[in-house]
Amino acid sequence: MPKLVLLRHGQSIWNLENRFTGWYDVDLSDQGINEAREAGVALREAGIAPQVAYTSVLKRAIRTLWLSLAELDRMWIPEIKDWRLNERHYGALTGLNKAETAEQYGDEQVHIWRRSYDTPPPALDAEDERHPRHDPRYAGLDPQQLPGTESLKLTLERVLPCWEGEIAPALRQHDCVLIAAHGNSLRALVKHLDGLADDAIMKVEIPTGRPLVYELAEDLSVQRSYYVQD
C-alpha cells in the first residue's frame, strides 16, 4: 500500500507579515525553519521513509524539503522540482498586505478572491516585473503557460498533469512519495484525491509544516488520510 506525504512549507517571511505571496520567492521565517525540521522528525518517528520527493521551484518549499529530509537522513533520495507545484498565483495582489488589501477593496471582495473556487484576483500585466515570464527559472517554458493570476480551479488545472504524468507513476514504483509544496497547490491535489466538491474544498486548510499522509490502494484510490503530528 503506497503512501503519499503532503507537506506544506513552513511559515514564510511573508506568511509572518500577512502578505499575498503566490509565486514570489520568499524564504522561510525562523519559525518556518523549525516547522520543517519538526516535520522531518515526526516522519522519522512515525517510521515513514520517502523514496522520492517532489517540490516546487520556490525556495520556501525547497528548503522545507531539504530540512525535513535532513532530519530523516534521506537527503540522498531523488528530488524533482516542478513549477506546476508552485503556489497559486495571486496576480496583482502579490506582495500586498492582506489587511490593507481588505481596506482598499472591501472584505467581501478580498474574501471572494481568496476563497472562491474559480474567481481569480486581478491579473498582473505581462510587462510587470513580478510576472513570471521575467523570471529566469521559467525561461524554458512557453510564456503562454505562465499565469498572470490564478484561481484555485486554474491551479488544479496545472497541478493535475503533474500528478498524472509524474507523481502517480512514481507511486506505482515506490512505497512512499513526499511532496513539499504550498497551501493551494496541495489543496488542489487534496480536492482531486478526495473527490471534493468545489464548495467543500474552500473549507479545507492545510497547516504549515505538518505532514499529511495518504495511504493509497494499488489503483491509487484513497484508503485513509491523517496528520502525522495529530
UniProtKB/Swiss-Prot annotation:
One of its GO terms (biological process) is glycolytic process. Signal peptide: none annotated. The keyword Cell membrane does not apply. Its EC number is 5.4.2.11. The active site is at residues 9, 87. It catalyses: (2R)-2-phosphoglycerate = (2R)-3-phosphoglycerate. Keywords: Gluconeogenesis, Glycolysis, Isomerase. SMART domains: PGAM (SM00855). Substrate binds at residues 8-15, 21-22, 60, 87-90, 98, 114-115, 183-184. It comes from the Bacteria. Residues 128-137 have a biased composition (Basic and acidic residues). Residues 117-143 are annotated as: Disordered. One of its GO terms (molecular function) is phosphoglycerate mutase activity. The keyword Lipid metabolism does not apply. PANTHER family: PHOSPHOGLYCERATE MUTASE (PTHR11931). Belongs to the phosphoglycerate mutase family. BPG-dependent PGAM subfamily. Homodimer. This is 2,3-bisphosphoglycerate-dependent phosphoglycerate mutase. The gene is gpmA.
